[in-house]
């Protein structure tokens, strides 16, 4: 994560002192293992697949994502709090029913836990389940309409245009591509899908290993799933500094404070997230 923080111009020292204080981020994923970086970082774990009460991650994807957002040492916003909803199984696959249960739980508990951000490092390929796609889109947009910052992955079906996954195609949510991955999902300007909003590093990102007991605390993973929590963490930094911002304001600020990579808009959106610029704006 040190490499990532250099790339996105993470501000050490005074500008990052708050580092997510007062912000709760929901992670909808495969779960979270109690990795040393994540002790005390989660205020709630809800297993919507197997109904278990203990923290666990039978895939590793969710633990990795959680570490990027709020790992004690490596996280983008180490003072943010996490709520982890397990909506993906041990293979990393999901079911529309579990995701919809997650969306409903968030809406019902938004005020209780001061939920400001939802990280969705998953997606459905467009055209595979039309009814399911509509439900997922509606669920994500309901969160946005309630003032929550919804940050979702662009998917890894690129480089062809129009390869953004669901719910990333929504005009409301913040869709994140990977700046250094040719397979990052692309928008389609011909179809007026002006996506992604921005990009972040997504190749060989080192974060928490769910199988840390084997002595390997960190593991590298790649994809827009890894780029997305970088942006969620940045949003937590911003909301910690300026808690009265609306989700629309957060979206505009993120896009206005990017570094242009001189790539096509369908690949980079507004550009590479620049956190120093974001917090100095």
Where are these regions (language model features)?
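Extracytoplasmic/secreted envelope proteins and their assembly/folding machinery
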Residues: 62, 66, 100-103, 137, ...
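Secreted peptidase-domain scaffold signal
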Residues: 155, 275-281
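Extracellular S/T/G-rich loop segment that most often corresponds to the catalytic His/Ser-adjacent loop
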Residues: 23, 29-32, 168-240, 278
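Hydrolase catalytic cores
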Residues: 66, 83-89, 163, 202-268
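Autoinhibitory propeptides
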Residues: 1-14
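Subtilisin-like serine protease catalytic core
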Residues: 14-26, 30-44, 52-97, 113-116, ...
């Amino acid at each position: 994560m040190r490499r990532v923080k250099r790339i996105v111009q993470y501000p050490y020292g005074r500008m990052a002192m708050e580092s997510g204080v007062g912000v709760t981020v929901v992670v909808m994923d495969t779960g979270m293992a109690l990795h040393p970086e994540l002790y005390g970082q989660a205020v709630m774990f809800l297993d919507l697949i197997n109904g278990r009460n203990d923290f666990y991650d039978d895939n590793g994807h969710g633990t990795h994502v959680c570490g990027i957002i709020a790992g004690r040492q490596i996280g983008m916003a180490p003072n943010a709090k996490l709520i982890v909803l397990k909506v993906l199984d041990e293979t990393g696959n999901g079911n529309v029913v579990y995701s919809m249960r997650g969306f409903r739980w968030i809406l019902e508990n938004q005020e209780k836990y001061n939920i400001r951000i939802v990280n969705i490092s998953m997606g459905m390929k467009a055209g595979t389940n039309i009814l399911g796609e509509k439900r997922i889109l509606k669920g994500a947009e309901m969160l946005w309409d309630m003032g929550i910052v919804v940050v979702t992955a662009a998917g890894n079906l690129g480089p062809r245009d129009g390869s953004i996954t669901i719910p990333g195609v929504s005009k409301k949510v913040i869709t994140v591509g990977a700046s250094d991955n040719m397979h990052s999902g692309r928008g389609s300007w011909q179809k007026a899908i002006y996506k992604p909003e921005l990009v972040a590093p997504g190749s060989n990102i080192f974060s928490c290993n769910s199988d840390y007991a084997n002595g390997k605390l960190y593991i590298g993973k790649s994809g827009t799933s890894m780029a997305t929590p970088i942006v969620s963490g940045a949003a937590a930094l911003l909301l910690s500094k300026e808690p009265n911002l609306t989700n629309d304001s957060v979206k505009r600020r993120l896009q206005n404070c990017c570094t242009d990579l001189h790539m096509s808009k369908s690949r980079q959106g507004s550009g590479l997230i620049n956190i120093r610029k974001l917090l100095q704006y």
